[in-house]
Amino acid sequence: MESLSELQNPLLPRSPTHLHGPYPYPEASPAWPCREKIYSYLLGGAGPAHAHQLLDPGSLQLAVEAWYRPSCLLGRDKVKEPRPGSCETSFTEGREPPAGPTERSTEPGQAEEDVAIQTVSYGVQEEFQGQEGDPEEEESDATSTESESEDNFLTLPPRDHLGLTIFSMLCCFWPLGIAAFYFSQGTSKAISKGDFRLANTTSRRALFLATLSIAVGAGLYVAVVVALAAYMSQNGHS
């Protein structure tokens, strides 16, 4: 069975005798030509050419390669390693928030405003219609009352004024009374036939002649009384 160190470090060789130091990487061979130059560069060796030399960005990689072989270097993938000074920009499709709740929340207020506007417009229209309809309603009411009165007047049978005509014929000026009595009889005949227009006409004529007969008879009676009084006064003086 394998040991615990082999299970923890499966990539390391089984004989670590050739390893040096705490790092599990093999050392470079002493015959490597760039090692002395890297030592002098990193340790600040004296040299007139090195006094004013600028820092090379690739010196760190060379220093690491000087200590360890390039084939045994283990590190992270440069492609996948995030850089501290870099920033990633990702483009995502912006989904607009559903406008359903807001629209639903605003729909009741708009419905109330519409309802209020509609009620106001209806009220104004009703007022205008009422103002415009008042004269028309009055005219229609007047015409309807007139038509109803005419209908009632036509439906009601006219009176024949029989008693008045008899009184005018016997007690007053009898020629006019006889004419009034004649129209009174014509009114009765028209009513029996159902001709209300003719009955109405004859009734008016009978009433007019009876009234005229009474007036004329009253005048005659007054004149006769005055004449008798004058005549008797003359006889008394003589």
Curated annotation (Swiss-Prot):
Ranges of the Extracellular topological domain: 1-162, 227-238
Record localization: Membrane; Golgi apparatus, cis-Golgi network
CC terms in the record's Gene Ontology section: Golgi apparatus; intracellular membrane-bounded organelle; membrane
Renumbered residue ranges of the record's region Disordered: 1-24, 78-111, 126-155
Stored InterPro entries: CD225/Dispanin_fam (IPR007593)
Domain of life from the UniProt record: Eukaryota
Parts of the chain on the Cytoplasmic side: 184-205
Chief location of this protein within or outside the cell: membrane
Bias-annotated ranges (Acidic residues): 133-151
TM spans (from-to): 163-183, 206-226
UniProt keyword list: Golgi apparatus, Membrane, Transmembrane, Transmembrane helix
Topology with respect to the bilayer: Multi-pass membrane protein
Similarity field: Belongs to the CD225/Dispanin family.
Name of the featured protein: Synapse differentiation-inducing gene protein 1-like
Record organism: Bos taurus (Bovine)
